[in-house]
Amino acid sequence: MSHNTFGHLFRVTTWGESHGAALGCVVDGCPPGIRFTRDEIQAELDKRRPGQSRFVTQRREPDEVKVLSGFVLDEDGETMITTGTPVSMLIENVDQRSKDYGEIARQYRPGHADYTYDVKYGIRDYRGGGRSSARETAARVAAGALARKVVPGMVVRGALVSMGEKSIDRANWNWNFIGDAENPFFTPDPASVPVFTQYLDGIRKAGSSVGAVIEIVADGVPPGLGAPIYAKLDQDIASGLMSINAVKGVEIGNGFEAARITGEQNADEMRIGNDGKPVFLSNNAGGILGGISTGQAIVARFAVKPTSSILTPRKSIDKDGNDVEVMTKGRHDPCVGIRAVPIGEAMVACAIADHYLRHRGQTGKGIGSRE
């Protein structure tokens, strides 16, 4: 299997499977002199970690990261400083239950990659989906934690804005509420917590699942990142988000809503601000024009389908060509969109970090220069 690497200068390779001994990533191209701590990497992984509420898989993985290479320790004994060589990180799997998957070793689960992996490779790891499992994304989150350090002043945040037929009230948006102990959904709307709780409890008790829409916002991104035609910043952000398990759609800025309004409504007008710098009067473009960042917040949303692993019996076939009925066992998320929030943040951070380095290398100018 090829294509386990993404990025051009900030290159991330992930490895490992759902029920293997471990998984991890190698980040090649991280500039020297980036200061970070293991705790900063761990904090991002903890946001994605399973088993933290009844609304996510009960697989108990501590996801403790080990940083193996690419750094020297500062005098404080905790701060790591990148040397410019590959940064390798490892996360052990400790709570696999491969026996839960014995019955589907030769059966194809509807909605999963079982059939397509078998068609392409002639072999598949049926234990939790192997490489196609969202377990792999823990490695991306680790890489994304490092990517956040590459672009000075950049802040990448994500939020769950809808779950199934339930949506947040954007008038209540509060970034500080995300991460609150009373908020298991990454919602920025405190009023949505009881709504999501009742809704997802009903879905979960019925043995079913539901999808979600996630919004990622990157502030502090300098203007000038990206390139026309085949190296657009929004193109690479969309590609990264589409690579996440269960993602079926991506939009930047107004996205599909832009097709429903007029040019007067959609085009972001400009003025010169009091400081002599350009100011946009709106951000329908999501911070990107012509594939190049404007300096505004970059806004992307992605749609996550309902988890295919449900308790309801489903019609399928097996490897021998027989009609079968499949009922999934094991531990699964009733809404995989919840834990997709930190994954989406990581993919956006990696894409922007990559374009930051590409811009710096290509133009020879300071970031955002208008010379």
Curated annotation (Swiss-Prot):
This reaction introduces a second double bond into the aromatic ring system. Pathway: Metabolic intermediate biosynthesis; chorismate biosynthesis; chorismate from D-erythrose 4-phosphate and phosphoenolpyruvate: step 7/7. Belongs to the chorismate synthase family. Homotetramer. Reduced FMN (FMNH(2)). Keywords: Amino-acid biosynthesis, Aromatic amino acid biosynthesis, FAD, Flavoprotein, FMN, Lyase, NADP. PROSITE patterns: CHORISMATE_SYNTHASE_1 (PS00787), CHORISMATE_SYNTHASE_2 (PS00788), CHORISMATE_SYNTHASE_3 (PS00789). It comes from the Bacteria. This is Chorismate synthase. It is an enzyme of class 4 (lyase). It catalyses: 5-O-(1-carboxyvinyl)-3-phosphoshikimate = chorismate + phosphate.
